[in-house]
């Protein structure tokens, strides 16, 4: 029943799915379009297990926005550089992403191996540049990215000032 109701609502223009659905859903089923796995996962409804996709179009990403976590770690899974890879995967197929970066050390905080952290802002600038370079879904619009930071983060003032400058660029 759900399948028939969804088809009716689409045909009657009563609803429209998120952009990743418009971009990708049905391409494999209707046209046989396929591509190599890009590191996505899907839930197998028969086994109820998370399965790594073998194709980039057979089980496309279903949502326009993903909230992702990031740890205060440079290169390991769940860390800063891993986040950029995960974001690129989502941007490629038309989705946006958001994260709270409050777990990252501030620029005045020490590192376990000695020295000081380069700070949260240095990594936010990298992520901003990476997102700006990617055309979301292969189209002309740029990737959508949301950044949040807790008010008690050591670099909060620098973050707010950076956001003001970026908003002024958009307004110009």
How should each PLM-predicted stretch be described?
Residues 1-172:
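Extended catalytic cores of very large enzyme megasubunits
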